[in-house]
Amino acid sequence: MANTGSWELAAQKLDQYDSIVIFHHVRPDGDCLGSQFGLRELLRVNYPHKKVYAIGDNCGLFSNFLEFDFDEVPSDEVLKKSLGVVVDANQKDRIFMREVLDKNLFAETLRIDHHPNEDDLDKVSVWLEEQRIAAAEMIAELAFQKDWKITEKAANYVFLGIVTDSGRFQFSDTSARTHELASYLYKNNLNPEKVYLGLAQTSLEDLKAQSALMSSLKTNGQVAYIQIDYKSTIALGKQPNDMARPNMIGNIKGYPIWLSFNEEQSGKIRVEFRSNGPIVRNVALKWGGGGHDRASGCMISTFDDVEKIVADCNEEVIRWQKEIKE
């Protein structure tokens, strides 16, 4: 899906409704949560007459330094007069509390996203910019263009999304505009130390989890990968979402693609693809997933498919190497 819509379109829809319900995606991360709560805080501060709801569950993520006080789902009568907003996601099966969307009660829906994938949302307007490093960067753009008042809470949430999805401003889609908008947050009440210290904080249990993942490290061809089953995750006192850490093994010399395979409670296995060049999205799409060129994901049913995915990734490395030589 090509870039579509604009901040003006998003602003028009947000201005139009006095009741707004904001969703995040399943297996939440810093970008979807930062975008969701950043937008809620910005709207509440700048439009105090509006009722703005953030629904879902952060699954304990980032609660050590930021507050995620989710709202109750409004009544059906309220939903009928509301704008539903999906940030950082597209398909309903990727959206937390999709059952609310499945009712098709919203007057309209708005999608704010940087993933180049089609959606199946009802009565939807889309603002999609694939080159953005994070959906939170788009929320920052909206705040900048609308000259909204930015509280410390709002700035911290939005900065969380930008920092985590950009890998601390290291990933390839980080742009001059990313830095300009981060600077704008610095000028408008951001507490960067709170965010960075919160993200850096670890525990003995975290170190044990990292050790378990590192002990599973394998290589095949030019692909490095780690994997862990659900039983081992629980034995470590963790939940599956805590163990999705592909960048632990990122950028090992000679391995331009790195993967993590993480079994969830359902028995399904979450696959995270990362690279510093090859287009891993091609492999993710083959396996029913999607995402960005160098950061994608999919779900598989069995660890028996691990070697097949690794083989596909090695083929993608070879294809990429041929391209850069031409």
Predicted regions and their residues:
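Short glycine-rich anion-binding loops that position phosphate/pyrophosphate groups of nucleotides
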Residues: 27-28, 89-92, 115-117, 230-233, ...
